[in-house]
Amino acid sequence: LRCLVGSEMCIRDSLIMAHNNWKILEKLLILLDDKRNDIYLHIDLKSDFIDFSSKVHNANLFIFHEIDVRWGDISLIQVEFFLFKTAYCKGNYSYYHLISGSDLPLKTQDEIHAFFDAHYPTEFIGFSLGMTCDNRINKVYIFPKYQRIKNRYGNKVLCLLRSFCVFLQNLLNYNHYKLQDKLMIGPEWVSITEQSVSLILSKEKIIMKQYRFASCGDEVYKQTIIGNS
């Protein structure tokens, strides 16, 4: 589950992605229910649609049930772009908070708003400096939608096929990533300004092309775009 919470200088925008843990999601929405917040919630298309509108009375809540999201697949990036773009079109948010439906705020809304108002326009995005992610993006991972399937034996077969395919690409020195940007990795959850969201959206076409066969590219593309800007 992913959620985007947005705000207009004093109104925040929350983008949420969700697929289960409905009780936690319900609690999250209640804690975010503040007139200064706009909440954009995407529920995985594989999951049953649940209307949480009755749980939110002060914030503006927008619920979407559009994309079949698969672990490690380009669909994770697609749903993030969907949320960023939908919120950006409304515009005038000082911060876009991309969070999981399993997250809960540890501070009150007054404390959270005061913190981000005091630190604007700082970008809050994590970088795992000791990790390398080149092989995640440089190589083509076959059957990216099926990196985690319920059939244990099928998982093993697909894992072996992917490993063999990557081995051949290494042998042939094949590099799928054609951009000059240095690849960077970090957590997918961020709190970023409208300026950064605009920059990310301007790269949509090339990101969808370059990350189509990547593994867990959602942990790479935002850090790479912002880190190289």
Sequence positions of predicted segments:
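Active-site-proximal specificity loops/subdomain of glycosyltransferases
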Residues: 56-93
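Short, acidic, metal-binding catalytic loop of nucleotide-sugar glycosyltransferases
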Residues: 27-38
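Active-site beta-to-alpha loop of glycosyltransferases that engages the nucleotide-sugar donor
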Residues: 16-24
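Short aromatic/hydrophobic "clamp" motif used to bind/position activated sugar donors
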Residues: 96
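Single conserved hydrophobic/aromatic residue that forms the stacking wall/gate
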Residues: 1-11
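Catalytic core and acceptor-binding pocket of nucleotide-sugar-dependent glycosyltransferases
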Residues: 159-229
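Conserved donor-nucleotide/metal-binding helix-loop-beta segment in metal-dependent transferases, i.e.
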Residues: 106-141
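Short beta-strand/loop segment that forms part of the nucleotide-sugar
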Residues: 37-48, 65-66
